[in-house]
Regions:
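Alpha-helix N-cap and loop-to-helix initiation/capping positions
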Residues: 1, 82-86, 123, 127
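C-terminal domain-boundary segment and adjacent tail
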Residues: 42, 92-158
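A structural signal for the main folded, soluble domain(s) of proteins
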Residues: 2-4, 8, 12, 109-112, ...
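Active-site-adjacent pocket scaffolds in enzyme catalytic domains
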Residues: 7-11, 15-106
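Short, acidic/polar
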Residues: 1-2, 95
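Detector for methionine-enriched segments
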Residues: 1, 55, 65, 77-78, ...
Length: 158
């Protein structure tokens, strides 16, 4: 199933697939080994830390990419039934904390999981735009995809 998924994504994207995020963060204890065996280099299913971490597998190292269920519009709005501004407040609070910590501890990574059918609708999109604007206004803030974060981390730790 993993290889079939990777092949379908590669065909659609037109480039090699190096990252993985399972639906609903679901996996088994064998999944990291299977992902590494299939050529996946990072996985966002492990909700740990604010920097990538290295996980040893039977087929080499697999990076775990920072991901947060606390900054995910599905639990916030669809399960906990909060209004859209809750995602804004949580995003800004987490960003401000990580930004302050980065001044003395070095770079931080913050994942923000939003879905077009939830946060992208007209009555919610303004709150997302406001959060993104807050972050973009701070010097040194970068908006990267997982592949870019992986490349940066591997260079920084080489």
């Amino acid at each position: 199933m993993i290889r079939d998924t990777i092949n379908a994504l590669r065909a659609a994207a037109g480039h090699e697939i190096v990252g993985w995020l399972a639906p609903g963060l679901t996996e088994t204890l064998d999944t990291p080994d299977l992902l590494a065996e299939a050529g996946i280099r990072y996985c966002a299913d492990w909700v740990v830390d604010d920097l990538p971490c290295e996980m040893r597998t039977a087929h080499g190292t697999l990076l775990t990419m920072p991901y947060s269920v606390e900054l995910n519009d599905i639990p916030i709005m669809m399960i906990q039934h909060h209004r859209a501004e809750e995602l804004f407040h949580r995003t800004v609070a987490q960003f401000d904390r990580l930004y302050a910590e980065a001044e003395t501890q070095g770079a931080k990574v913050m994942g923000l999981a939003v879905h077009p059918y939830i946060s992208g609708v007209p009555h919610r999109i303004g709150w997302l735009e406001k959060a993104l604007g807050h972050m973009a206004a701070r010097p040194g803030t970068l908006f990267w995809q997982g592949r870019q974060i992986m490349d940066w981390y591997l260079r920084a730790t080489a």
